[in-house]
Amino acid sequence: MSLATLDTSQHPNLPSASATLFKAKAAKKFSFEQIAQHIGRNEVATAAIFYGQAKASPEDITNLASLLEIPQEVLEDQLSGFPDRGKSVEMPPKEPLIYRLYEIVQNYGYAYKAVLNEKFGDGIMSAISFSTKVEKETDADGNNWAVITLRGKWLPFSRF
């Protein structure tokens, strides 16, 4: 199994914790799934902590420090603030897989919006009260399929 690593020269907008966490992850040869199981989080949420896009709880910091053998004080210092979300990827993205996700929204965004509005009314799907997961399916022909589930609380627009 290949593991996700980080080339900091390609990601200058990431926080210092990203380099610390990815270096330890590579040294331990852990997948995000393994780390997530240890800290009790979803693997996408765990990866988001590594990329500075999610806030680590004090318990997350303790568990990450223990598992990855990083001094807890270092992680407390690097992960104690609030994430500066949205700065890690230039728009439009250049990385092919991230661009495909962007392209899905470009191609199907209005279709998603229309169907969601018909089902729920005028509003938006929250990215705050939100969860996501990634699964792998293999069909009868042996083809692998990526299944990405997005689950967000529906927030109706208020009338004023």
Swiss-Prot record:
Catalytic residues identified in the record: R100, E103, S126
CDD domains (alphabetical): Cyanase_C
Gene3D superfamilies: Cyanate lyase, C-terminal domain, lambda repressor-like DNA-binding domains
Catalytic activity annotation: cyanate + hydrogencarbonate + 3 H(+) = NH4(+) + 2 CO2
Domain of life according to the entry: Eukaryota
One of the Pfam families matching this protein, by short name: Cyanate_lyase
A GO BP entry: cyanate metabolic process
Enzyme Commission identifier(s): 4.2.1.104
Keywords of the record: Lyase
Entry's Gene Ontology molecular function annotations: cyanate hydratase activity; DNA binding
Keyword Lyase: yes
Signal peptide per UniProt: none
Job of this protein: Catalyzes the reaction of cyanate with bicarbonate to produce ammonia and carbon dioxide.
Family listed: Belongs to the cyanase family.
Name of the molecule in the record: Cyanate hydratase
The organism's taxonomic lineage, starting at the top: Eukaryota, Fungi, Dikarya, Ascomycota, Pezizomycotina
